[in-house]
């Protein structure tokens, strides 16, 4: 695990974005941890979040021309990632996002920002069922652009209804790489370094054993 990944986990814990305990997920599973990126909700949070996304993006080595943030949660993520790439990595990258409702006046349409073209890096908070990715693929394809990859904050590395995860389904269906700032494996490594969190470590390991990919 790299330094920025450890820092991201601590950032998420401090903001209570990442919690350990017992949580019932939409799937009905009882999870030993919960991740709610919506709690990154201040200016400082967004500035730091952008740095972590930019770091993971540069670390991945994936070539891309434009950042796309699907409405709604992806919009501030794309924006802050673009700012961080410019400020900390000297990369002035165009960005774009969509509206849920088409605008009928002014410039019109469903897209805001730079023209949607070239190799697109889609940024979002998490992938649960892959629905937002599929909707975004229709938008990206309609503009003649191609998907370079997908970047999210956390990969839970757990099976969906099938034997593979929603992320693996996206990679299979769209022939792209999905990268994340951290994964469930990274959370386990972090917990292994914290003796005072041994109970949580045992619970997360058991969960991975049951639902992991």
Swiss-Prot record:
It comes from the Bacteria. It is an enzyme of class 2 (transferase). The keyword Glycosyltransferase applies. It holds the Pfam family Pribosyltran. GO terms for biological process: 'de novo' pyrimidine nucleobase biosynthetic process; 'de novo' UMP biosynthetic process; pyrimidine ribonucleoside biosynthetic process. Its EC number is 2.4.2.10. Its cofactor is Mg(2+). Coiled coil: none annotated. One of its GO terms (molecular function) is orotate phosphoribosyltransferase activity. GO terms for cellular component: cytoplasm. Orotate binds at residues 34-35, 128, 156. 5-phospho-alpha-D-ribose 1-diphosphate binds at residues 26, 72-73, 99-100, 103, 105, 124-132. It catalyses: orotidine 5'-phosphate + diphosphate = orotate + 5-phospho-alpha-D-ribose 1-diphosphate. Keywords: Glycosyltransferase, Magnesium, Pyrimidine biosynthesis, Transferase. Pathway: Pyrimidine metabolism; UMP biosynthesis via de novo pathway; UMP from orotate: step 1/2. Belongs to the purine/pyrimidine phosphoribosyltransferase family. PyrE subfamily. Homodimer. Catalyzes the transfer of a ribosyl phosphate group from 5-phosphoribose 1-diphosphate to orotate, leading to the formation of orotidine monophosphate (OMP). This is Orotate phosphoribosyltransferase. The lineage of its organism: Bacteria, Pseudomonadati, Pseudomonadota, Gammaproteobacteria, Enterobacterales.
């Amino acid at each position: 695990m790299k330094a920025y990944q450890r820092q991201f986990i601590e950032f998420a814990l401090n903001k209570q974005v990442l919690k350990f305990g017992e949580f019932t997920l939409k799937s009905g599973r009882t999870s030993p941890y919960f991740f709610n990126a919506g709690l990154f909700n201040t200016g400082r949070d967004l500035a730091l979040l952008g740095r972590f996304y930019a770091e993971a993006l540069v670390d991945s080595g994936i070539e891309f021309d434009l950042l796309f943030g699907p409405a709604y949660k992806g919009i501030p993520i794309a924006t802050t990632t673009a700012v961080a790439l410019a400020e900390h990595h000297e990369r002035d990258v165009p960005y774009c996002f969509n509206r849920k409702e088409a605008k009928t006046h002014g410039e019109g349409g469903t897209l805001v920002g730079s023209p949607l073209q070239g190799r697109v890096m889609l940024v979002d908070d998490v992938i649960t069922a892959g629905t937002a990715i599929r909707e975004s693929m229709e938008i990206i394809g309609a503009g003649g652009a191609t998907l370079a990859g997908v970047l999210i904050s956390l990969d839970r590395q757990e099976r969906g209804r099938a034997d593979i995860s929603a992320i693996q389904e996206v990679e299979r269906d769209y022939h792209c790489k999905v990268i994340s700032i951290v994964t469930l494996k990274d959370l386990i490594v972090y917990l292994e370094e914290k003796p005072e969190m041994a109970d949580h470590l045992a619970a997360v390991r058991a969960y991975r054993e049951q639902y992991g990919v």
